[in-house]
Amino acid sequence: MVEIRLSSGKILNKKVHKIGVIALGSFLENHGAVLPIDTDIKIASYIALNASILTGAKFLGVVIPSTEYEYVKHGIHNKVDEILDYLRFMINWGKKIGVEEIIIVNCHGGNVLIEEHLKNLEKELDVSIEMINITFTHASTEEVSVGEVIGISDVKRLEEHTNFEKYPEVGMVGLKEARRNNPIIDQEAKEVETSGVKVDRELGRSILKNAIEKVVKKIEEKIAKK
């Protein structure tokens, strides 16, 4: 058998190869005029991949299905079980290449619905699983600013973006059912109605820097325990 040189390259140390990083977001979700429908998974992938590059942890890829609260209607989503099945597939393959611990970088609020199932998945697959949630008011200033930094925001369409009748999902301002059912969503929508949506590259860079550092720190903590 070929000897794999675990200590090669710019990595924290060879223990980092036992840690796998997965991106979780959504692929089919309206984000107004400025942002694409797969904004969440692109942001999650950017954060997860950069944390992997900085540490040497294995970037295992992206989860394709996503889920959402029933009362939030701004995209096409899947069942919680479908996400868990996809994670089983990814994690089992990760185990075959030496991964023992999983960090999920999630950038879609609806996916927090899977968290209560992760302990059972850990026991079933005999791995450690931890989810880091990095979410924003939907399609609003923070998300648009992050999107501008990573190159996915079409800022020329910002004025159109805040037409809440045409794009009710922006800030969830026009998603009446979601606002009725969730006071946090309603509060965020009120703030967007009042303040609008702005593009702030400095804010976007700061959010990304802090998010990547958060994942890197978690990887470092896991290595320190090994």
Curated annotation (Swiss-Prot):
Residues reported in the UniProt entry to bind Fe cation 2: H31, D40
Hydrolase in keyword set: yes
Recorded family membership: Belongs to the creatininase superfamily. FAPy deformylase family.
Transmembrane region(s): none
GO BP term, example: F420-0 metabolic process
Pathway: Cofactor biosynthesis; coenzyme F420 biosynthesis; Cofactor biosynthesis; riboflavin biosynthesis
Protein's recorded name: 2-amino-5-formylamino-6-ribosylaminopyrimidin-4(3H)-one 5'-monophosphate deformylase
Gene name of the record: arfB
UniProt superkingdom: Archaea
Keywords assigned by UniProt, alphabetized: Hydrolase, Iron, Metal-binding, Zinc
GO molecular function: 2-amino-5-formylamino-6-(5-phosphoribosylamino)pyrimidin-4(3H)-one formate-lyase activity; ferrous iron binding
Cofactor note: Requires one Fe(2+) ion for activity.
Cofactors that this protein relies on: Fe(2+); Zn(2+)
Species this chain originates from: Methanocaldococcus vulcanius (strain ATCC 700851 / DSM 12094 / M7) (Methanococcus vulcanius)
Reported function: Catalyzes the hydrolysis of the formamide of 2-amino-5-formylamino-6-ribosylamino-4(3H)-pyrimidinone 5'-monophosphate (FAPy) to form 2,5-diamino-6-ribosylamino-4(3H)-pyrimidinone 5'-phosphate (APy).
Quaternary structure, from the entry: Homodimer.
